[in-house]
């Protein structure tokens, strides 16, 4: 966009005045010719049409550099719209872009249980291509990432939804390409009635698949009992077939407005990238705006204070499945979480773990 100030015209008039002083014999006709040229110059400038589609990058602040025990540096930023960004540069064959949305099944109404997972599916069904975001059709993300030799996926959990793209960077512009795609998925989805109706089938099929998995059944029963979650859904994350069939475009749009906004997202980059260059690309593309107000639901978790045992008999099981759950430390308690991981590894996750040894005996 051009800035039409008076400095250029003032300089032009100055040239006319100098010419008039040096040529006092010039007649009125010559003076009028100069004035006409001035008018012509001004008219030509006014015909320039500014490009209103140019998008200004979101500003950002570098909040620090964290250093892990292995020497890995993590460059931390916060965009002016509240979105957090963490960049971990390292030599790697793959560069991975993850965006975590701070929402999951614990943010759903019970009669809409499963809508977080449904919205995860919708993210791959195309974007509108408005407001300067990239236009994507159904399956375009999978196709384009596949053409680059990469992979893409997403997952929904109790408290977060994660979108990931991982590629080998053969070309310099590949990183910006995947950032543009993911930012469009987060901010510019096509959520028409037709698109929502088409996704009912795949999502309900997935629910039916999970209902036949003994380990999934056991895990859901354990979680619901551990935190006294009152729900009509057998699967806390996937929801029920009835819930999903009742999801329409209005419910999807409302859920997005209340949960998918910059201040509720964190983007993490790992791989062979320059942090200074990467943050500029991210700030230019993740330029979403926060709603003036939100109506977020938070599940009231009430951990049990005594041991609960549930036995499930299923004709779908081919072996015995056991699940043990307990209320662990908060997410930001790094020390205790590391200790819990070590205990889990010792007890469960090795071939020669204590549990396996006991079962063998």
State each model region's role:
Residues 45-56, 78, 134-294, 320-322, ...:
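Charge-rich, well-structured scaffold segments of protease-associated domains
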Residues 78-81, 87-89, 101, 154-156, ...:
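Pocket-edge structural micro-motifs
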Residues 91, 96-168, 234-236, 346-361:
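M16/MPP (pitrilysin/insulinase) zinc-metallopeptidase core fold and M16-derived inactive scaffolds
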Residues 98-100, 294-356:
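His/Glu-based metal-binding/catalytic segments typifying zinc-dependent metallopeptidases
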Residues 75, 83, 95-97, 114, ...:
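Structural beta-strand/beta-sheet cores of well-ordered domains, especially the beta-sheet scaffolds
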Residues 42-87, 274-313:
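Proteolytic maturation boundary segments
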Residues 1-29, 33-44:
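Short, compositionally biased, intrinsically disordered N-terminal export/targeting signals
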């Amino acid at each position: 966009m051009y800035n039409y100030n008076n400095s250029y015209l003032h300089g032009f008039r100055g040239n006319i005045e100098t010419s008039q002083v040096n040529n006092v014999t010039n007649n009125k006709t010559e003076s009028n010719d100069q004035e006409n040229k001035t008018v012509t110059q001004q008219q030509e400038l006014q015909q320039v049409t500014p490009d209103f589609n140019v998008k200004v990058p979101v500003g950002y602040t570098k909040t620090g550099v964290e250093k892990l025990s292995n020497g890995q540096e993590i460059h931390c930023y916060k965009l002016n719209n509240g979105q957090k960004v963490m960049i971990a540069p390292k030599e790697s064959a793959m560069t991975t872009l993850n965006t975590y949305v701070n929402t999951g099944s614990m943010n759903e109404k019970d009669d809409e249980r499963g809508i977080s997972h449904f919205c995860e599916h919708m993210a791959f069904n195309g974007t509108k291509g408005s407001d300067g975001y990239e236009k994507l059709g159904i399956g375009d993300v999978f196709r384009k990432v596949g053409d680059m030799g990469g992979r893409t996926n997403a997952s929904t959990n109790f408290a977060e939804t994660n979108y990931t793209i991982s590629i080998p960077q053969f070309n310099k512009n590949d990183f910006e390409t995947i950032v543009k795609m993911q930012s469009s998925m987060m901010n510019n989805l096509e959520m028409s009635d037709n698109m929502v109706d088409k996704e009912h089938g795949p999502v309900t099929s997935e629910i039916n698949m999970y209902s036949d998995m003994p380990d999934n059944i056991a895990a859901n029963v354990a979680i619901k009992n551990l935190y006294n979650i009152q729900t009509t859904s057998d699967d806390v994350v996937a929801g029920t077939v009835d819930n999903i069939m009742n999801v329409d475009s209005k419910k999807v749009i409302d859920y997005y407005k209340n949960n998918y906004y910059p201040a509720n997202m964190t983007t993490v980059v790992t791989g062979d990238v320059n942090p200074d260059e990467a943050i500029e690309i991210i700030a230019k593309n993740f330029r979403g705006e926060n709603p003036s107000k939100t109506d977020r639901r938070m599940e009231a978790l009430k951990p049990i204070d005594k041991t609960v045992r549930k036995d499930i008999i299923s004709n779908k099981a081919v072996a015995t499945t056991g699940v043990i759950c307990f209320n662990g430390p908060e997410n930001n308690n790094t020390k205790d979480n590391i200790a819990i991981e070590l205990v889990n590894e010792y007890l469960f996750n090795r071939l020669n773990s204590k549990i396996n040894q006991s079962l063998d005996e």
